[in-house]
Amino acid sequence: MNKTGFIAYMESIDLAPKTIEKHVKFTKQFFARVKKEDIQVTKPDVLKFLEYLKNSRKLENKYRSDFLVSLNHYFTFLYEEGTIAENPCWFLKIQGTNKKKLHKIYTPEELDQLFDNYYLLFVRNYDDSGKHWREHSKIQAKLAKERNALILSIFINQGATTDEIRKIELDDIDFIKAKIKIRGGKKLNDRFIPLKATQIGLLMNYLQNIRPQLLEYQTTESKKLILSLPATIKTTRNDNLFRWAFNALIKQLKSIDKQFINFQQVRTSVITNWIKTEGLRKAQYMAGHRYISTTEKYLPNNLDELIDDINKLHPF
């Protein structure tokens, strides 16, 4: 066990001293039990150890999960420094330890359907004839819905956060390479994500027909791709400029799909789908994660269902 390197790794990801101490302690107990070198440890070894904690030490799932977290950190450290080719803790999770309510994870097809339904209902077939609005209010509402369709498209296809969507600039779009730059921040890296073919037309329409009209409502010239309207321009805080727009879009999506919660749910779905189609490393880049351990949290997990299959393929 590379204790010194492990501690340095955990310090680099800002874990608390007591947490580091616990992870070292639990990892030591694992190696004392399995009696193998780092590179020799396999998934069945981890599963067998977790079964030992359950059957011999009579530990509850919560404490077994703590051991698994420690081991996952250690093998992630070895994976990132190139010592091992695969983390044996990938896809493992103790059943019954997650107390958070699980929300729906959308498939790529379901995300596309969510966008199509929004576009048909609120853009293409939207009827405001029954609205007793002034003409300029109807124009603003139409512009907002066209803009929100583009926002939703970026959420669904690029997996961006709300803050990242605010920061996209005109120069971040490369039509020749069919890519868009997503600007990160303190916690996320910059990355270039491919544009889907269906997004090209949406972007062209927005840039040629919608954004110029939105620009008329701005007090200064802007390089931002997404522009706000008077209802949100009046806010005194820049970080609140799009809150009204995002909240309105959430409300509209909830009216379409009762299982829709928020945009974090969409991002979680997108990253989960990337892992399945692109692999863990590429998904890490596309999500903007600085550490592979962050991406690993999106892996589909269920330890108890895996044990029998692993036993059949890799006998202890």
What are these regions, as identified by a protein language model?
Residues M1-F316:
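Conserved catalytic core of the tyrosine transesterase superfamily
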